[in-house]
Design a protein with these regions (language model features):
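First exposed extracellular module after export/assembly in secreted or surface-exposed proteins
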Residues: 28-226
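Bacterial Sec-dependent N-terminal signal peptides
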Residues: 2-5, 11-43
Length: 226
């Protein structure tokens, strides 16, 4: 019996250790010098900096006018900055669009500014009504890119997904001057489009969803007609 208990405790200890290494937020992690340099160069006025690791990334939580989090790869390449901003800090075009939308009467919660490598800046307004919570994604010019049910997932869901050159070439040729706003890979194994890459673009002022299959070939493009 003692041997069984010891084995169980050892297994639990190993599991806890692995989890701690994957998501270390105790503020005592060692940050490589090149990463420190990259952060200081990009955010020279950052204050109250605290480092942690999430999903294999180094994440700096800091204050630079507003509370923000910056995500970097281990070799110091910046991936994303998520800034918590007040409503009045939104571009006027975003506020005008929101205030004329069906969600204008909903209660506003968090508002985030997302800056990511490879895609344009996006503003996310989280609204709620009774038991419903929805995230509204806007471009800086006030275009509503998409609205999705808030799942309270980790912020890593906003990390950019790299498009293949073939995907980029297809978008450039099929939709000239399109602005790439969001890139997601469907990760629900129960959905028919598991593993597909969804690219949200704005083409000629119209938000469109471009879908590529698991082999990277174009599958479909859809948009709303009003």
């Amino acid at each position: 019996m003692k041997l069984k208990i010891y084995t169980l405790l050892l297994a639990l200890s190993v599991t806890w250790s692995l989890q701690s290494c994957d998501n270390d937020d105790d503020g005592s992690i060692a940050v490589p010098a090149e990463l420190q340099s990259a952060f200081s160069s990009k955010f020279p006025n950052a204050a109250n900096v605290k480092w942690e690791t999430k999903s294999g990334y180094y994440v700096a939580d800091f204050y630079d006018g507003y509370e923000a989090s910056a995500w970097f790869t281990q070799d110091g390449k910046w991936q994303m900055t998520e800034t918590d901003i007040p409503y009045n800090a939104l571009p006027q075009a975003v506020k005008t669009s929101f205030e004329s939308s069906e969600y204008a009467s909903w209660k506003r919660d968090d508002i985030d500014k997302l800056e990511r490598t490879g895609v344009e800046t996006v503003f996310v307004i989280e609204v709620e009504k009774q038991n419903q919570e929805v995230d509204l994604y806007y471009s800086a010019d006030g275009t509503l890119i998409k609205s999705i049910v808030d799942t309270d997932d980790d912020n890593s869901e906003h990390l950019p997904v790299q498009l293949t050159e073939a995907m980029k070439n297809f978008i450039n040729e099929k939709y000239p001057n399109a602005r790439i706003m969001e890139v997601d890979v469907e990760d629900d194994r129960n959905d028919w489009d598991f593993g597909y890459t969804e690219v949200d673009i704005i083409h000629n002022g119209i938000p469109k969803d471009v879908l590529f299959n698991q082999t990277g070939n174009w599958y479909s493009t859809s948009w709303e007609i009003r």
